[in-house]
Amino acid sequence: MIVALTNDDGIQAPGLRAMYKALLDAGHEVHVVAPVTEQSAVGHAVTISLPLRVKEFHENGFRGRGVYGTPTDCVKLGLSCLLDKKPDVVVSGINAGANVGPDILYSGTVSAATEAAHMGYPALAVSYDSFRPADLSGQAAHAAGLLATLDWQALPARCVVNLNYPAVPMPEVKGVRACPQTRAVWKDWYDHRTDPRGGSYWWLNGVIPPETVAPGTDRALLTEGWITLTPLRFDFTDHEAMDVLARVQGDGVGGQANAQTGGQTGGGI
């Protein structure tokens, strides 16, 4: 397969380098377009007011293009302009830190995969449940194998496969589970600190309270030692709320007389 590889931790991140080697070892043709600098938690940001510059990286058997931009910039620019061949799949990762539940709203890793899916490419986001991963060669090899095993044709159009690895050695992993996202949310707080020169600053911290995590969801299974697979799609529509909003729809904007509320008027907001 022809694989386009990106991430949000930067082109020199250990996770991307491990994924690159594993994909090559598995016989894939790999083309890297990744951020030059770390872009963690930038979400789906796109650069629109600055030029995008590209730097070539050739070192120790690694070849890739670094973009001075966001993960989404890398995907858009890479697939539109930089790559000579159309990839069969786009892989984003391996990210340092899990991307489960609400994380996907902030994740540059998942956003890169989502952008690829929007552009019509099969997309895989890969993350590891630790911010200080040591050797990710085992996880990368497993992900490369999974890439060839997945039935991409059977997945819905614009589906992103979100793959997360638990923070345990691969021999201790319990197995692989397909599962939904947790709906638990982060409990955030900011530490107020002082820098060495006496200046004041704030540092974000947070946790997903374990008691709020439903069993069988990605966060729960990952904590238990399972590899998790979650299909994602970009559709923020709250379909359950459509009927409520439909009550105030109608023709014109001269009041609620034409709204589909049984013809009643008055009692406005």
Curated annotation (Swiss-Prot):
Answer yes or no on keyword Cytoplasm.
Answer: yes
Arranged from A to Z, the UniProt key words for this protein are:
Cytoplasm, Hydrolase, Metal-binding, Nucleotide-binding
- Cofactor binding notes: Binds 1 divalent metal cation per subunit.
Q: What Pfam families does its record include?
A: SurE
What are the annotated GO cellular component locations?
Answer: cytoplasm
Catalyzed reactions per annotation: a ribonucleoside 5'-phosphate + H2O = a ribonucleoside + phosphate
Q: Which InterPro entries match?
A: SurE, SurE-like_Pase/nucleotidase, SurE-like_sf
Q: Which residues bind a divalent metal cation?
A: D8, D9, S40, N95
What GO molecular-function term can you cite, just one?
nucleotide binding
Cofactor(s) listed: a divalent metal cation
Q: Which family does it belong to?
A: Belongs to the SurE nucleotidase family.
Q: What is this protein called?
A: 5'-nucleotidase SurE
The record lists the organism as Nitratidesulfovibrio vulgaris (strain DSM 19637 / Miyazaki F)
